[in-house]
Amino acid sequence: MTQTRRDNSRIIRAKHGSELDATHWAAEAPLRMLMNNLDPDVAEKPEELVVYGGIGRAARDWESYDRIVATLKRLKEDETLLVQSGKPVGVFRTHKDAPRVLIANSNLVPNWANWDHFRELDKKGLMMYGQMTAGSWIYIGSQGIVQGTYETFVEAGRQHYDGDLTGKWILTGGLGGMGGAQPLAATMAGASMLAVECQPSRIEMRLKTGYLDKSATTLDEALEIINAACAKGEAVSVGLLGNAAEVFPELVKRGVKPDMVTDQTSAHDPANGYLPAGWTLAEWDEKRESDPAAVEAAAKASMAEQVKAMLAFWEQGIPTLDYGNNIRQMAFDEGVTNAFDFPGFVPAYIRPLFCRGIGPFRWAALSGDPEDIYKTDAKVKELIPDNPHLHRWLDMARERIHFQGLPARICWVGLGERHKLGLAFNEMVRTGELSAPVVIGRDHLDSGSVASPNRETEAMMDGSDAVADWPLLNALLNTASGATWVSLHHGGGVGMGYSLHSGQVVLADGTVEAAERVGRVLWNDPGTGVMRHADAGYEIAKDCAKEQGLDLPSV
């Protein structure tokens, strides 16, 4: 069977408007969102089906993509398409309230859950890496992580700088699909940012989409811009063309002191996502094909040097955090025994939100009309009137975030709020206030949908960091609740062997039946997050469960 991974002739964009290519909206929705993942304004390498995160793909190969598209176009209202690591493998009769698509990506039996075995299967065409929202068809560009990054920086500012990041600057690495959100999140939070990125195309994309203010080609130039802005109390973001493994140690050597340090390089995938120190991009590209083991070894050695620099900042009292790319683990494996001295961002800043089921709720307008998103923004403010922080976020998002592909919005809301918003959006579709249906989903990075001991479930108070039952239960419950498509993935964010996670997307098409599904899914999905944290002993989660009337027999 022919398998084509690269096709430069392909330019994919989702259909806009109310005319369907599928036979009904529940199949049209995943069709448009799959295509949206591969829009050139959205994906990192759309010609290779790569959406973000190293080699996070939307489909296994172009032949599989074409078969998925053809199948969705003919899928009946009582049928379910099964997708195995980016390849459509079956259509079965279920019922109208069942998911239209069920997706399993990158899942390996634990003893074989490592990059070496994955790469063997990947090379044979038997598997693909789905990341989190790449293979589950709900990536919305860098906006998808902007608010989570913003919330992290704001909370860090509260904890370390009395809530004021004016005149402060953050050092980071990586401006890919996820890391590209950092500069905008920083300036929204009031801080400047120096972001080190080795690929010029990524800097150019972040400048083009408004996520980055300026670029620099030398460290001196970048520091001059940062220092000038901080002196004036202004917030500016600078993308420095360079290698984080070289720039971080150089800053330590010079005695330069950022006010916060983190990293979002694709360290989770050392063979494909991290440029070794001293290497050119051309050498890196060639060696990834000819000698991936050498690339991985050199990349891990370079990560160790970067983490040593991060530890040096931490030891000087500078807030330093792992932003979930598993770089500490890579350094630890290279002999940096104190790599975990500085914390991950979830236990340091985000877990109290997870305890209340608050996480990255997102929706996209299938019409392609930005006005549909602006109307839903107003509806969120109307239904959640007493949250000025959320209102400020929505105002900033409208002003500063450029839509990529289909217009979309993200805002962090929790149990008791998500279902109200979803039902309101469905009603707006029914009355014609919105010009076409919307899809409502989230990142896999959420309170009840992931087991990842070096990220979302790091340092759980009961020691249950590695218990992977929770994302499985989340996926099963969302399937039973009637989500339009449900996904279960392995290895997203932190790489093979380090995470299991699930996702859901539900369609609001204005029908009574959709309202029932939306209400169930958007209550149950965040409810599993409160359940998971209450079960682990967090009092905030127990209180939330009691307030919301959750039935948790063991709590």
Curated annotation (Swiss-Prot):
Keyword Ion transport among record annotations? no
How the cofactor is bound: the record states: Binds 1 NAD(+) per subunit.
Q: Which EC class is the enzyme in?
A: lyase
InterPro entries according to UniProt: Urocanase, Urocanase-like, Urocanase_C, Urocanase_central_sf, Urocanase_CS, Urocanase_N, Urocanase_Rossmann-like, Urocanase_sf
Q: Which residues form the active site?
A: 411
Gene3D superfamilies assigned? Urocanase like domains, Urocanase superfamily
Query: Which is one Pfam family of this protein?
Result: Urocanase
Q: What PROSITE patterns would the database entry show?
A: UROCANASE
Which pathway is it part of?
Answer: Amino-acid degradation; L-histidine degradation into L-glutamate; N-formimidoyl-L-glutamate from L-histidine: step 2/3
Summarizing the function annotation, the protein's role is: Catalyzes the conversion of urocanate to 4-imidazolone-5-propionate.
Name used for this protein in its record: Urocanate hydratase
Give the species.
Maricaulis maris (strain MCS10)
